[in-house]
């Protein structure tokens, strides 16, 4: 089928111009429903193979709206491990259990009935043995009842309480959860993930509870017929089935569902943070120094030109244990003067604070130089990769990391696609989540960002090209190989000469690949080749030509289309109105980059310490991470401050992402500073 970016961009008429995020949600739901259909059929077949599928059960399975409902219906027919109930069945006690469970009006005395099932050879030596076995069978029937499970699940969700307690009193990051209770329905995702981690590390004991007075009466009403001879016996079996089998099973399910919901929320949060990180505005065309701080191995430096090409590298040792500060300053000054360096990108890892202080001090003598702290997460992973050794042969692993840090400032998207998105580290508990699901979600975000920006067909790396709609790692490498062997591409149609890139792949990828050097200006726009005729017809109708596109002479294009009528113009061009609007946008700004419309990266020239902060100070910072309970903001003191969700705005919001994104430049007011614990509390709403 078609790829999500292609559908989102070039098939707007068919889906009402939904964005890629909404289309991915639809795809997810479609996959769930397909899996549900598949599971329904599997369950029906499995029950039919046992000869137990009747019309009523078949209809119930067909009507099940969730996988959990299907599994509840299948539960009584599943192959089970050896249980007390299966042992009782082996002793021939199932007919007795069925008779007692029916609680017929004219039923004989239960002990008299049980006496008929004595069988010392099978271990049924007394009436008590027979009744105990029958009770075990009834308890399991209750635990396997789809309706009982549905009712209890609903009750636990509505009235259950999750509690955690300390296994040991030693201090830990889980102290908040040493004596914790919260209604199941009110559990926050970050609480669930923290408690799970504490339990896995042996620091917390966790349980879910619900009052017997809430849970048992509905089950008793469901299974016990008051006034019948076997009523008390069945009631006792219901209570046993509830406490021994049904509740522990539902407790596990509820906790699994809480975890699944928390994982899904955290994955969405990670994706939400990753998107603006990838879409940070590039700082193009400036000579940049990448500075990878360190201690024992020194601080690695790499100078790259405006296109990211490496000009020089060095290692300095201003930090412990060497403390060669003056020699480091001399080397930095020499590089700045020699290459006219304008920006310095400092990695935010080990020794970053000392490095920032050194750079801020040094550039007081160089008024045109600015620095910025760059998220270096994943840079070391990239620098040790096969890709890095191919791109930067002859450079030490540590120096490659400095090159990557410089390029991350120049073009964050082009550089970050070389790293596994999971390694970029802008999420909560990312290592505790289902890794396949996390990878799928994050790859989707990277794909959407890359296609939103597009890629230069003649300069893009295989890593960047592999995220373009329709392309794979193999076709991306084939494009680069073709480029190396035949020189640059001059037309989009040349893509069809690339091995393993046929018409179908061309249709998916062509609109997202730009060729600034092409003789056809449309090849450097987001206009798809299938719409070139429509674009040319539009220009003709409005009294323009392709030459006007090159000279940016289409300032009145929108107004002329409005005069002609958008719907009528679209019809004359043979496209829908949404496609016409996109063509107009592209013709007015050929080669446009959506990232250029965002606030520019905040470059600094001086540094502050946490001790310099005072409550009431108003500062400008950059949002580094958005989480469920707030956002962390870099205010230039080497310790990100926390803006709690209650301090973001005066109006009610469910999640900080409704207002903030990673990379946003915000004004904040300092509320509180704890130097010892290195905690800074900030407010956005009080800074206004």
Regions found by a protein language model. Give the residues of each.
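Feature marking long nucleic-acid-engaging regions of large polymerase/nuclease enzymes
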Residues: 2-17
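Long, highly charged, low-complexity intrinsically disordered interaction regions
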Residues: 9, 28, 34-52, 62, ...
